[in-house]
UniProtKB/Swiss-Prot annotation:
Homology family: Belongs to the Maf family. YhdE subfamily.
Keywords attached to this entry: Cytoplasm, Hydrolase, Nucleotide metabolism
Lineage of the species this protein comes from: Bacteria, Pseudomonadati, Pseudomonadota, Betaproteobacteria, Burkholderiales
Pfam families: Maf
Primary residence: cytoplasm
Protein name as catalogued: dTTP/UTP pyrophosphatase
Enzyme class: hydrolase
EC code(s) of this entry: 3.6.1.9
NCBIfam families the record matches: maf (TIGR00172)
């Protein structure tokens, strides 16, 4: 049994969600010379489902190498990746305010999918889970989109919004996992952690 895990994620939401589960963790973040962004390039013809699972697994492999390179004690490693897709189009993190505005305009008045993949690596192997949720946004005015983008909240978030923040006012309905939409589906994550023999 393990008493803690390594979290290979910079996301404050994922930290909050792990704490909510009562999981002890240490951060295992990328070194300066690692090109984390290169992992997130969409491959030609790749579906959103395949994309998010591939990126999550690559993050786990990179974190495992990082743990070994730093000669850290053995403990499970958790990685996660979230993507938003509308139709078959992957909406990643916006590059700037104009990019965020375009994404939010596309999401306005429609239903999109939020896919969050989770990978846990332990001595028992590499185990994966995928959470798929549907989110319906009410129609948003151009002024509302502009105000939200000006808040700075959309930057750094897949699909240009965080459901736990100001964007909650645009969410008409969700089907699936609220924590998954935030970035770490707790039901699936807890099952993976039990598989990895983590005490929490």
């Amino acid at each position: 049994m393990h008493d803690y895990l390594y979290l290979a994620s910079q996301s404050p939401r994922r930290r909050e969600l792990l704490t909510q589960l009562g999981v002890r963790y240490e951060l295992l973040l990328a070194d300066d010379e690692e090109d984390a962004e290169a992992l997130e390039v969409v491959q030609p013809g790749e579906t959103p489902d395949d994309y998010v699972q591939r990126v999550c697994a690559l993050k786990a492999e990179a974190a495992l190498r990082r743990r070994e390179r730093r000669a850290l004690p053995d403990a499970p490693i958790l990685t996660s990746d979230t993507t938003v897709c509308l139709g078959g189009e992957i909406l990643g993190k916006p590059g700037d305010g104009a990019d965020a505005s375009a994404m939010l305009k596309a999401l306005s008045g429609s239903t999109h999918r939020v896919l969050t993949a989770v990978t846990v690596v332990s001595t028992l192997g590499m185990h994966h889970a995928l959470s798929i949720s549907r989110v319906t946004f009410r129609a948003m005015t151009a002024a509302e989109i502009e105000r939200y983008v000006d808040s700075g909240e959309p930057l750094g978030k897949a699909g240009a919004y965080g459901i736990q923040g100001r964007a909650a006012e645009f969410v008409e309905r969700i089907e699936g996992s609220y924590s998954g939409i935030m970035g770490l589906p707790l039901f699936e994550t807890a099952a993976l952690l039990r598989q990895a023999r983590l005490r929490f």
